[in-house]
Amino acid sequence: MKTIFFILAITSSVIAQRPSAQKNRDVLFDFRKEPPASAVKIPAATQRTVLTKVFRRYLTNQDKCKSDFAGSSSDDYLAAARKAGMMVPSITDMITGSFTAAGQTQTAYLISVSECNASHADNFGTTRLAIFSGPQLVADVDTDFMSFIVRKIDLDGNGIDELLMNSSYMGQGNLTEMATLASFENGRRHVLNDFGSVVEDSCAAAMPGSNSKAAVIYTSAFAPGLKPTFTQENYVASCRNPRRWKLFSKGKMQEQ
């Protein structure tokens, strides 16, 4: 009996001394879940103030668009349209933070440029991010078609916020979403990680074998002064049971 108590005491002592498991990663975003739709409403006066500072000239009505303008036959049609003022821009989202330098109180406006006659192949136009410190425009960058703000985060703790953004493209019933994490330090866009495809959903195509694929992106646990590392797990679900996700790969998702 004494032997049993002795063994139990030793076991309890070992367990007590064993270090608890440490959390070594955090979820950056789970794309199996729909990102919340932006509830931000931009007043008309703010739209005018921001757009006037970002664009030298622009249109306020699609009916005023022209197909024949200077540079309309150039290889870069969208750039020519912007230069000619042939666009009907609008602010689609906004977020506050410290984006270009630490310790700032700034507002970032996401702008759908909507160049005149931009086609489906052009993703219906470019997207820009305009960052203001008070009334001053401090950054105006193209987002490379990233048209939604998914999350704001300061991953390395340097006081500068990064933005996780995504884009979506639908073709023949196949939905593809891409995502990037970018910093706007010093007023320039720096892509910290291009995650590639994070959603591939073919359910709307209603073809044999159609399914839904989505990524969960993790970042290493916060450590001051260290750059974060990322891991990606990819899940698949049938169109009939969209909530029953199964892990099928790790790393970047292979395009269908």
Model segments located where?
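Sec-dependent signal peptide recognition
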Residues: M1-I7
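Acidic/hydrophobic-patterned starts of short beta strands in beta-sheet-rich repeat architectures
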Residues: S98-S112, D154-Y169, I217-T231
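Acidic, small-residue rich beta-repeat scaffolds with periodic aromatic anchors
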Residues: A16-D76, A80, G171-Q256
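Repeated scaffold domains used in trafficking and secretory/extracellular systems
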Residues: M146-I153, S202-A205
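Hydrophobic h-region of N-terminal signal peptides that target proteins for export
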Residues: L8-Q17
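Short consensus segments that form the blades of beta-propeller domains
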Residues: A84-M86, E115-N123, V141, Y169-N174, ...
